[in-house]
Structures are given as structure tokens and as C-alpha cells.
From Swiss-Prot:
UniProt xrefs under Pfam families: Ribosomal_S7
Protein's name in the database: Small ribosomal subunit protein uS7
Main function: One of the primary rRNA binding proteins, it binds directly to 16S rRNA where it nucleates assembly of the head domain of the 30S subunit. Is located at the subunit interface close to the decoding center, probably blocks exit of the E-site tRNA.
UniProt KW keywords: Ribonucleoprotein, Ribosomal protein, RNA-binding, rRNA-binding, tRNA-binding
GO BP term, example: translation
MF annotations from Gene Ontology: rRNA binding; structural constituent of ribosome; tRNA binding
Family membership noted in the UniProt record: Belongs to the universal ribosomal protein uS7 family.
GO cellular component: small ribosomal subunit
Domain of life: Bacteria
Organism lineage: Bacteria, Pseudomonadati, Chlamydiota, Chlamydiia, Chlamydiales
Gene that this sequence comes from: rpsG
Subunit text: Part of the 30S ribosomal subunit. Contacts proteins S9 and S11.
Record-linked HAMAP family: Ribosomal_uS7_B
């Protein structure tokens, strides 16, 4: 165990337009090379496109619902017992749940071929809202992996 004190959680201020801390964290994850204004433009225009596509009057609520649909509940962690390594299913902590969902959405939005980031992000959010697409598939694969290794659940630490 580390002898140092636990790292303090950095407080992220709410974003200026919607007043949401979650959205500001999402913007920070989209940001590359410290260019926050570009990340903000991308996220806000993607949110507008997304809200139009799903027919939501409140883009923030729709975004939070899409994020909720992408959050994993279980994941597997490697645990070495004797000479064998087991994939042990564990519940995902609330903060990590948010973080994983955001990372997956951004990863698959960037992977969309021939589209700008804002179009890809809007499309991926629509897919998450409708419970389909690459992000939801990743979540289901994670859950399936945890379900398949349920026999090793007693190795929790």
C-alpha cells in the first residue's frame, strides 16, 4: 500500500451554457492538446444536432439519458491466484462508470470514418439514446464477459 495520502479530487466547474458538471467533464475528455474552445464548439454543436435528431427540447437531459444507457454496471478485473490469472467480475464504481461511458462514446465517435467529430459524436449519442451502436455493444460485451466469469466472483478483494 502507498504511504502517501490519497490524491485530492479536482473540482470541475460547471460548463457556462448548460450549467452541468458532467457536460464539462465530457468536454474535457473531448479536448486534445489543451484546445478547450475547440472542444466546446464540437460538443455544443454535436449536442444541438443530437437534440434535433431525437426530437428532444432539452439537449442536456437527452445527453444524460444517452450517457446513462452507455454506463457499464459490471466489469472484469484480473486477479492472480497461485499460478493462474482469473478474470473476476466486479461492480463498477459510480465515477468510473461515468468515465468509461464518456471514453467509449468519444472513442467510437472518433472512429467513424469520413465524418467530422461533431457529426460522429452526434451520431454516437443518438445511437446511445436509442440503445444501439458501438458503445452499447461494448457495454454489452463487458457485461457478457462479467457474466461468463461469474464462477470466479468469490475471488473479490
Amino acid at each position: 500500500m502507498s504511504r502517501r495520502h490519497a490524491a485530492e479530487k479536482k473540482v470541475v466547474p460547471a460548463d457556462p451554457i448548460y450549467g452541468s458538471v458532467t457536460l464539462e467533464r465530457f468536454i474535457n475528455k473531448v479536448m486534445m492538446h489543451g484546445k478547450k474552445s475547440i472542444a466546446r464548439k464540437i460538443v455544443y454543436s454535436a449536442l444541438e444536432r443530437f437534440a434535433k435528431k431525437v426530437g428532444a427540447e432539452n439537449a442536456l437531459e437527452a445527453f444524460e439519458e444517452a450517457l446513462e444507457n452507455a454506463k457499464p454496471l459490471l466489469e472484469v478485473r484480473s486477479r492472480r491466484v497461485g499460478g493462474a490469472t482469473y478474470q473476476v467480475p466486479v461492480e463498477v464504481a459510480a465515477g468510473r462508470r461515468d468515465c468509461l461511458a464518456m471514453q467509449w462514446i468519444i472513442k467510437f465517435a472518433r472512429a467513424k470514418p469520413g465524418k467530422s467529430m461533431e457529426v460522429g459524436l452526434a451520431t454516437e449519442l443518438v445511437d446511445c439514446f436509442n440503445k444501439q451502436g458501438a458503445t452499447i455493444k461494448k457495454r454489452e460485451d463487458t457485461h457478457r464477459m462479467a457474466e461468463a466469469n461469474k464462477a470466479f466472483a468469490h475471488y473479490k478483494w
